[in-house]
Amino acid sequence: IGCPCQRSTFLSFRWASPIEDFKGQMLRLFDVGTREEDIMVDNLKNIGFDIRYTGKDQLKIQIAPHVICRPDGVIFDGIPDIDEYPVNFEMKTMNRSNFEKLEKQGLRNSKPEYYDQAQCEMYGENTELETEVKCTLFVALCKDDSRIYAEIIDANPDYMELILKRARNIVFGNSLPEEYSIDPE
C-alpha cells in the first residue's frame, strides 16, 4: 500500500506482475533482519521495556478487506516520555546509504513505505488490544556498523484516510492506476 507506484501494487495484488523468486543472498538478508529484530527485542526487554506480540506471536491487524499487517511487537511500558500505551514497535535493517538518508530526512521523507506501514499498523483492527495505538516506535539498525536510529511516529488519521483510499482503489478498483514512472528502476 505504501509503495509510491500504485500501478505496481495494483498489479501485484492481482498476481499480474512477475512473482519475485528470491535467491539465496536475498533470503539470507531477510533472515538477518529477522535475527536482528529478535536481538533488538531482547535488548529492549533488558533495559526495562514491556514488549509483547513479537516473533511468531505478532498481532494480525486488518486495515481493509484483503489488507493485513503485523507490527514487530507491541510495547506496554518502558519508553521514556511516553505516557499512553500501547505503542507499536517496528524495526528494519538498512545499509549505510539508506540509514544515513533516514537520519537526515526522518522516516516519512526517506522511507515513505515504512511510514505508511506504521500508520496502517496503528489504524487497523485487532482482537487482542483493548485500546487504540497512538504511536509507533520505529527502530532502524545500520547493517554496516550497527548504529541505531529511533523515531516515534504519531498516528496521523488524516493521512491514514489517504492510505485507506489507496487500499480501496487497489483492492476494488476496476481500472489500472496511472504510471508512477516509466523508469524501470
Residues of each region from the PLM?
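Metal-dependent nuclease catalytic cores that hydrolyze phosphodiester bonds in DNA/RNA
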Residues: 1-88, 94-108, 112
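A short mid-domain helix/strand-loop element embedded in enzyme catalytic domains
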Residues: 91, 95, 141-144
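Metal-dependent nuclease catalytic regions and adjoining charged, substrate-binding loops involved
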Residues: 101, 105-115, 120-185
